[in-house]
A protein has these predicted regions:
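Catalytic phosphate/metal-binding cores of nucleic-acid and nucleotide-processing enzymes, i.e., regions
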Residues: 1-92
């Protein structure tokens, strides 16, 4: 079965948010409930990302790098930050 490109995380049993899997196999998760590192979606969201092998990624100093699995998320990202993260991961 092929993975869906777009998934709501409520479908997966998580908090409010969504996941996107790009043609390069990388996945980004954007969460914005009261139980995340965000302001509940008022102005910020929590973001996590994985490469096509399932390795966790962090975006820092304008580049994606692999981090220890589940060790951190990108907290309190603005709308502009989320847009940049989505675009750069889709091109990685």
């Amino acid at each position: 079965m092929k993975n869906k490109a777009f998934t709501t995380t409520t479908e997966l049993g998580y908090h409010d948010g969504f996941q996107m899997t790009f043609e390069n196999g990388c996945t980004i998760s954007v969460q914005f409930s009261k139980h995340t590192y965000s302001d509940g979606g008022e102005t910020t969201a929590e973001v996590a990302a994985w490469d096509n092998q399932g390795n966790w990624l962090m975006f820092d100093e304008d580049k994606w790098t692999e981090i220890e699995n589940g060790s951190d998320v990108m907290a309190r990202q603005s709308v502009s930050d989320v847009a940049k993260l989505i675009y750069t991961l889709s091109q990685w």
